[in-house]
């Protein structure tokens, strides 16, 4: 699951980091 704040900043989610729904970072595809 991708979690972003209202500004699209990276948030921790399940130990993974996401920059945008289309660009998972940390191997969270």
UniProtKB/Swiss-Prot annotation:
PROSITE patterns: SOYBEAN_KUNITZ. Keywords: Antibiotic, Antimicrobial, Fungicide, Protease inhibitor, Serine protease inhibitor. This is Kunitz-type trypsin inhibitor IVTI. It comes from the Eukaryota. Monomer and dimer. Gene3D superfamilies: 2.80.10.50. The keyword Lipoprotein does not apply. InterPro entries: Kunitz_inhibitor_STI-like_sf, Prot_inh_Kunz-lg. It comes from Inga vera (River koko). Inhibits bovine trypsin but not chymotrypsin. Also inhibits trypsin-like enzymes from midgut of several lepidopteran species and inhibits larval development in those species. Has fungicidal activity against yeast C.buinensis. Has a bacteriostatic effect against E.coli. Is not cytotoxic.
């Amino acid at each position: 699951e991708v979690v972003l704040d209202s500004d699209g900043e990276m948030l921790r989610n399940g130990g993974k980091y996401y920059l945008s729904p289309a660009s998972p970072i940390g191997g969270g595809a």
